[in-house]
Amino acid sequence: MTPNKEDYLKCIYEIGTEVEKISNKEIASRMQVSPPAVTEMIKRMISEGLLVKDKSRGYLLTDLGSQLVSDLY
């Protein structure tokens, strides 16, 4: 896993502990990157089984994504 993906996983985890809905815009703001950059990374992470998109809650870590985050902390 790349350090960039690790940063995204940690960011998404941290946002999830603070707000109800994890949005593309929130991730971009916290990571200080453009929304299109977030969209591309999110697509990759969904295809790798690290995230899922929920209509009401935004982006959520899968069990695999959660496990990887716990390994990072």
Q: Predicted segments — roles?
A:
Residues 2-33:
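N-terminal helix-turn-helix DNA-binding core of bacterial DNA-binding proteins
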